[in-house]
Amino acid sequence: MTPKNFEFQPGAILHDAIVGTFRAHGRSFEAWCKENDVLPSNARNATFGQSRGPKGRALLARLIEAAGPEFLRLAYARRIAEYADTVKKGAA
């Protein structure tokens, strides 16, 4: 899968990665929402996968683009790997 067609799985890990990516760039999730006339609750619903309709998917795409897809992909992959390690340790 190339970075161009990489699909993020909505959920807590993606939400944390998006928030972290904004912070890493000196911005905030809430500030982006305010600048873009988006209710933070709607943005959270999109990142957590609670809003999977056309509007929710479009909002998620905007958030991913604003966060920086390449940097976000790295942050997301790191968080997924950390979670997988936690699961492995818990299952042992």
Task: Tell where the protein language model's regions lie, with residue ranges.
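Short, charged recognition helix plus adjacent turn
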Residues: 71-92
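The alpha-helix within a helix-turn-helix
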Residues: 33
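Recognition helix of helix-turn-helix/homeodomain-like DNA-binding domains
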Residues: 38-53
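DNA major-groove recognition helix of helix-turn-helix/homeodomain DNA-binding modules
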Residues: 55-74
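A short, Lys/Arg-rich alpha-helix, primarily the initiator
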Residues: 1-24, 72
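Residues within the helices of the helix-turn-helix
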Residues: 19, 30, 61
